[in-house]
Amino acid sequence: MNATHAALEPDGLRPGRPRRHRRRLWVVTGILALALVPIGTLTAAFQFGLPWWMQEGDRNHVYESDTGSQGYQVHLPPQYDGTTQLPVIMAIHGCGMTGYGWNSMKSTTQFNTLADREGFIVVYPTQRVFRNAINCWNSDDPREQHRHTGEPALLAGVAREVVEEYNADPSRVHVAGASSGAGTAVILAATYPDVFATATSVAGGEYGLNQVDPNDPGATPPDYTARQAWSQMGDNARHVPLLVIQGEEDAVVPPIVATRLVAHWAAVADFVDDGLFNDSQVLVEETTTVRAAQGRHPYTHLRLATPEGASVVESYLVEDMGHVWPGPDGDGTYTDRAGPDASAIVWEFAKRHPMR
């Protein structure tokens, strides 16, 4: 009988065996679930930080739109009262970083301390690993270089939401980025000149840098990509002052990229002037070299400005500095405390250039 019944069971399986198989499956599933909980927790901590990392004045948000969702943290200084319209600085992190989690733009720049002293709002968007495995912003992807789409649309949406939610000054919204975030900041200056008054690139490159062959950069002149940046501005075209900070020893983004960026943005200004690349925009050049103080890196400051004194592009080329955000109080993997105070430089630049 037993043999007969066994032969009649589907696939020759005995009735008890599927139960043991299911029990093993449940055990394995349970183990996997338990393993995924800490992995998920660690991923969340990496990207969004831990509750006790929050400082006074910090608030977390998620921007939602048809384009997608974007997490970000806002820091409100003590001067914030909901009625006085304060300036805004959006700080965009680089690869292997987050906005306000582990190895964050928040700790790297120490903007919160400066904001508390000077009275401005800071915004830290953070990339999601499902968009980029090493948490880069996708500024080298042509699909992420246009208005109304992708990361530019999300970040501009965040900026607008902050202005509305916290009654910030829409004429004093600025963006600063590091590395891939610097590329995104330049893209935002081109695609949303009606949202961002100025842009800062720290260890970043020009709009459309992905079109430039590192082995033959001269084959793609800066005015070629500048025309594309200007065309992205559309009816909102205007001079968006750009600040560039670059380390001479940067092996990831070499100094030639910053040199190109300066020429590129000067060309954008030329196109904005009359739609032609014809030197119609007269620029006055000023160069200042700051010698090394004890324990500090020397640097050269270049300023290209209109005859009326408005900066078109300024750059800081820092000797003995690599692929970092410089500043005396920076805390993170990509910092150099011997460099000039980039956060203070960004703020001083922003103060001089509200949207006109």
Q: Where do the PLM segments sit?
A:
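Short beta-strand/loop motif that positions the catalytic acidic residue
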Residues: V244-Q246, D250
